[in-house]
Amino acid sequence: MGEVWRWNKEVEMDSIRDCLKHFSSIAIDTEFPGCLKETPMDASEEIRYRDMKFNVDNTHLIQLGFTLFDRRGITKTWEINLSDFNEHKCFKNDKSIAFLKSNGLNLDKIGEEGIGIEEFFRDFSQILKEKDGKITWVNFQGSYDNAYLVKGLTGGKPLPETKEEFHETVEQLLGKFVFDVKKIAESCSGLSSRFGLQRIADVLQMKRVGKAHHAGSDSELTARVFTKLTFDLLNSRKQCVRRVDHQQYQLEQQQLMMTRCYIPIPIPIPRPRSVMFAAHHPNPYFGGGYFGMPVQGRNYVL
């Protein structure tokens, strides 16, 4: 895992550029000073976006982690340390800052040796342009991750006013292929969208590389979980298709057997011969009169 600071930025950015020539999927994670406005659980989508916009517009990103990967595996993870946040001067959520510190983030070092947000995103934007939008982005519960990316890639401008405009901006900047692992987990047996990243990794028996709640480690784990879940879903889909094909084959065989054995086959029935009757003289023993008597030995066609 590569830690990116002001003093090694040039080398690491060149490494990112080279790796993006061969890998087109990026898993991201962000660490930021928490939420200034807490959103109620039952809030509408409009209120959720309004609160997110307020929080992102008024805070500074602390770390950006991203991992380049494809279906063959992971190439490398970078943890970008960004220097704009100042614990003593900037807006923050005190509980969130205490939480980050308890998990080992050295905010003083990041502020002193990190890279300016504007400087980093200027270089990063240029690298992304070279890919011409052919990138798949992956996150975990990534609304804020996407929001900080949009803010950075637009030069620190406020987020769009509405969630519809925000989604359009995300598509313009990141493309159409943006996946949230938390939502993918809804479709997987034994998992739930209520699970956090670490719990999903535990269910999948995946060991973390690095420390939790560090942007680099979280992005690396997100990439591996995404690869595992999508691989399993693909296999599950293939198995489902095979089961359907097998059931269809059995049905066709049953229909074929019905055709062979149970559909009535018409059997030709010979046309009966016509019988001509001839009048005979009355028998004197039966009271007289005439009666019909079949003519023997002759065939007549009517």
UniProtKB/Swiss-Prot annotation:
Named cofactor requirement(s): a divalent metal cation
Q: Which UniProt keywords apply?
A: Cytoplasm, Exonuclease, Hydrolase, Metal-binding, Nuclease, Nucleus, RNA-binding, Transcription, Transcription regulation
Localization per record:
Nucleus; Cytoplasm
Looking at the UniProt record for this protein, which Gene Ontology cellular component terms does it annotate, in alphabetical order?
CCR4-NOT complex; cytoplasm; nucleus
**Residue intervals passing through the bilayer:** none
Keyword Calcium among UniProt keywords: no
- Record field: catalytic activity: Exonucleolytic cleavage of poly(A) to 5'-AMP
Superkingdom to which the source organism belongs:
Eukaryota
GO molecular function, a single term: metal ion binding
Sorted alphabetically, which Gene3D superfamilies does this protein's record hold?
Ribonuclease H-like superfamily/Ribonuclease H (3.30.420.10)
Indicate the segments annotated as coiled coil, or none if absent: none
Q: Which EC numbers does the record give?
A: 3.1.13.4
Keyword Amino-acid biosynthesis among UniProt keywords = no
Q: Which residues bind a divalent metal cation?
A: 29, 31, 145, 218
Q: What is its main location?
A: nucleus
- Subunit note: Component of the CCR4-NOT complex, at least composed of CRR4 and CAF1 proteins.
Biological role stated in the UniProt entry: Ubiquitous transcription factor required for a diverse set of processes. It is a component of the CCR4 complex involved in the control of gene expression.
Family indicated by similarity = Belongs to the CAF1 family.
Report what the protein is called.
Putative CCR4-associated factor 1 homolog 4
Q: Which organism is it from?
A: Arabidopsis thaliana (Mouse-ear cress)
